[in-house]
A protein has these predicted regions:
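N-terminal accessory segments that position/regulate proteins before the catalytic core
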Residues: 1-36, 40-50
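Glycine/small-residue-rich phosphate/adenosyl-binding loop
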Residues: 2, 66-146
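C-terminal helix-cap and adjacent tail motif
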Residues: 2-9, 13-22, 112, 189-222
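Short alpha-helical scaffolding segments that buttress acidic/His motifs in well-ordered protein cores
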Residues: 30, 52-56, 191
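Small-aliphatic-rich amphipathic alpha-helix that forms the alpha element of a beta-alpha
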Residues: 52-56, 125, 130-178
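Glycine-rich, charged/polar anion/phosphate-binding loops
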Residues: 54-57, 108-112, 175-177, 200-201
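Glycine-rich phosphate/pyrophosphate-binding beta-alpha loops
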Residues: 57-64
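A glycine-rich helix N-cap at a beta->alpha junction
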Residues: 90-98, 180-205
């Protein structure tokens, strides 16, 4: 067995203020993020997409296999094809697949099977989870790893002043087909990326967050 090699950590990031203060400042940015369904067609440069995805790729992953692939789509014809396929699946969802409880939970959000934003947003970022490496090797904890990377992508987009939406049409096999992806890449999430429309609105129901004392426990006893 080959002994692992190590290097010095390097100079840790110093926010220049106490940890709680730095975290609160970051929270102030993230807390303004909204899932946007009304986008402007205002151009977003390719360099911005590259920088945002580069942030996502800093996520930790099982055995550092980095089991993700990000496909950026701006071509109008391809976006139109993705919208048509996504809406087909969504019609099935709302008409047959979703339970009554699910549909009732969606009512306050005002969602439906019309996904105009898939054509209006300047970019669609399709996140793929790799079930194997490109050379046929194993990946580990790929769901968790890609989930972490996706969250970091959303945070980076917010830091860049751009809006996003996490869209998961089910099933998503059509994305691999339309984008020519190999069998070991599974569509994980479809993320429109861009500026919000000037008259963009968001559902009140989506703004509230559980209080910290409900989601954070310190040293709980059985």
């Amino acid at each position: 067995m080959t002994a692992p090699e190590f290097v010095p950590l390097g100079e840790p990031y110093d926010p220049g203020c106490p940890p709680a203060e730095a975290a609160e400042a970051f929270h102030g940015i993230l807390a303004r993020r909204r899932s946007v369904r009304f986008f402007s067609d205002r151009e977003v440069p390719r360099e911005a997409v590259e920088a945002i995805v580069r942030c996502a790729t800093t996520a930790p992953s099982g055995a550092n296999k980095q089991p993700w692939r990000f496909v950026a789509v701006s071509d109008p014809e391809l976006k139109s094809a993705i919208r048509a396929a996504a809406e087909k699946e969504e019609r099935e969802l709302y008409a047959h697949r979703a339970s009554e409880e699910w549909l009732k939970d969606l009512e306050p959000l005002g969602t439906d099977d019309v996904k105009e934003y898939l054509e209006v947003a300047p970019w669609l970022i399709v996140v793929f989870r790799m079930t194997a490496t490109d050379d046929g090797g194993k990946t580990y904890y790929s769901d968790e790893s890609v989930g972490l990377a996706t969250g970091m992508l959303l945070a980076a987009a917010q830091m860049a002043g751009l809006s996003t939406l996490t869209h998961t049409p089910s099933p998503m096999r059509f994305l691999a087909e339309l984008l020519g992806r190999p069998k070991h890449e599974r569509a994980y999430m479809l993320i429109p990326l861009g500026y919000p429309a000037e008259d963009c609105t968001v559902p009140i129901h989506a703004i509230s967050r559980k209080p910290l004392e409900e989601v954070l426990l310190f040293d709980p006893k059985p």
